Amino acid sequence: MELTQNPSVLELVQKTAELTTPKEIVWIDGSEAQLESLRKIAVETGELIKLNEEKLPGCYLNRSDVNDVARVEGRTFICSRTREEAGPTNNWMDPDEMKAKLHEILRCAMAGRTMYVIPYSMGVIGSPFAKYGIEVTDSIYVVLNMAIMTRIGTKVLDALGDSSDVILGVHSKVTLDPENRYIVHFPEENKIISVNSNYGGNVLQGKKCFSLRIASVLGRREAVSYTHLRAH
């Protein structure tokens, strides 16, 4: 059941589901009951190991795949419209070429899996400084860590309303194939796509992807807009 009627969010969820074909879609409402249910599922599947409750209450262990233990600079791209816009220290690929590549990787990537829709806020929800995002993922690890690192759930969607001012993100573990691992940013579209990784720095999109890379573009864009307004 959708938790919002926001057109941008619904379009992201629909298009991602059509491409990745998950068995079900779960919207993250931010409740402790839902998060605890996901922890139990992750323990049952072996994705999480619950630690000694007396010594480390409420703590879990997650082990990364041996080939997926760090950020990958060579697989991180800024797909702006022009190479110059990406900057001299970043990897660049034509946006259309990269999208075609990612679509093939994501095709049926979530078959048999659950797709989670995470509404999150960078900053206090409702603050004029808050920035909102949506991350669609097939990883419980991502859901649980985004709940720790950001503010998540229905309150974010309520604050967002029908606004299109939102960062849209897609993530899938796919097969964790390092040869097809990509962390990609489309700054003009406010969009992030990461595939074939389940490592924090690559897949917790509010962290490096949004608050470092996309936010630097937003800062420049908003500063230019503000300067333009003052000039007139």
Model regions and ranges:
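Generic surface-pattern signal
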Residues: 18-22, 40-47, 107, 111, ...
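Long, basic/Gly/Ser/Thr-rich N-terminal segments
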Residues: 44-207
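N-terminal switch/interaction subdomains of large nucleotide-dependent motors and GTPases
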Residues: 203-226
